[in-house]
Design a protein with these regions (language model features):
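Active-site-adjacent helix/loop segment of glycosyltransferases
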Residues: 208-286
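A conserved acidic beta->alpha catalytic loop
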Residues: 22, 38-47, 64
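Short, flexible, basic/aromatic active-site loop/helix in glycosyltransferases
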Residues: 133-172
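Short aromatic/hydrophobic "clamp" motif used to bind/position activated sugar donors
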Residues: 84
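Glycine-rich, basic loop-to-helix element that forms the pyrophosphate-binding segment
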Residues: 61-79, 100
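Conserved donor NDP-sugar-binding/catalytic core segment of glycosyltransferases
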Residues: 94-128
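Short, acidic, metal-binding catalytic loop of nucleotide-sugar glycosyltransferases
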Residues: 21-31
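A short, conserved alpha-helix in the catalytic core of glycosyltransferases
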Residues: 164-224
């Protein structure tokens, strides 16, 4: 077996079905398997997916939502491929994507993990697909807005690396878990995903450990996927916001805290707490405004339409 493709599903039948279909529409000369882990979906998506792909996909059904890292690890343990590909359920691959990436990995034995270009539905680059590690200084530039103010600066925008050409290939610190191809021997060396990360930063942590072990993480944009990023919509549940900021703190504690002074750690904790509070407040205000808008009378709604149309 050459590639084991691991997809985690949680209440996303349409997206997951499209992702799997795009995989089976691939033009490949190698053998691959698809392993789908369902995190206790409540929308009957697992039943529909099993009916649709029962002869072509291996299924793991969980009785609880175990999170992204733990579910992927279940798939990795079952996988037989030389390469393990983490593929988000809200993505679609191009017909040449798998072939291109396997060919690249076969010809670059020093590369431990690779990712392709990841595009959003509007055709713009998903900036998460090639990143620097979130050091305290990098995080400060990102949170303070300096990275947006100087997007082409290698110094101020070392997180999203917008100073680099998105169509050129190069080593990077971090790739995105939406499409992350890793060698089996790398996983045997550095271990599985850290299951303390429920749904964010598990890819960042993995890439950090891969790089620390002497392997290269590589951005290879000779092929691409589309990432629909369903979970990034506004009005997101509180749990998602909480898990993101909890994972941010966990990553800092795991890899950076012992390198920095108490004052730097205090700064990081304060920054994470403030960002969490601001995000929750913003989402709450958005929900309240949305609720108020939906409860408006038909006459008010028509008047609002007229104003927005310039009537």
């Amino acid at each position: 077996m050459d590639v084991s493709i691991i997809i985690v599903n949680y209440n996303t039948y349409d997206l997951t079905s499209n992702a799997i279909k795009s995989v089976f529409h691939s033009k490949t000369t190698f053998k691959f398997e698809v392993i789908l882990i369902d995190n206790n979906s409540s929308d009957y998506s697992i039943e529909r997916l099993k009916d649709e792909f029962k002869n072509n996909v291996k299924f793991i059904e969980n009785t609880a939502n175990l999170g992204f890292a733990k579910a992927n690890n279940q798939g990795i343990r079952l996988a037989k491929g030389r390469y393990i590909l983490l593929l988000n359920s809200d993505t679609t691959v191009e017909p040449d994507t798998l072939e291109t990436m396997v060919h690249f990995m076969d010809n670059h034995p020093n590369v431990g993990a690779a990712g392709c270009k990841v595009l959003l539905p509007d055709g713009s680059l998903d900036k998460a697909c090639r990143r620097g590690f979130p050091t305290p200084l990098t995080t400060f530039y990102y949170v303070s807005g300096l990275s947006k103010l100087f997007p082409k600066s290698r110094h101020f925008n070392s997180y999203h690396m917008e100073y680099l050409d998105e169509d050129e290939e190069y080593p990077v610190d971090c790739l995105v878990g939406a499409f992350l191809m890793v060698r089996r021997e790398v996983i045997e060396q550095v271990g599985l995903l850290d299951e303390r990360f429920f749904m964010y930063f598990e890819d960042t942590d993995w890439c950090y450990r891969i790089q620390q072990a002497g392997w290269i993480n590589y951005y290879y944009p000779r092929t691409q996927i589309t990432h629909y990023k369903r979970g990034s919509s506004r009005g997101r549940p509180f749990r998602i916001t909480y898990e993101f900021h909890r994972a941010m703190k966990l990553f800092y504690d795991k890899h950076y805290r012992h390198h920095y002074s108490f004052l730097v750690t205090l700064f990081m904790y304060t920054g994470i707490a403030l960002k969490f509070a601001l995000t929750v407040s913003r989402d709450l205000l958005w929900k309240m405004a949305n609720r108020k808008s939906s409860s408006a009378t038909p006459a008010v709604k028509e008047q609002a339409k007229g104003v927005s149309a310039g009537q």
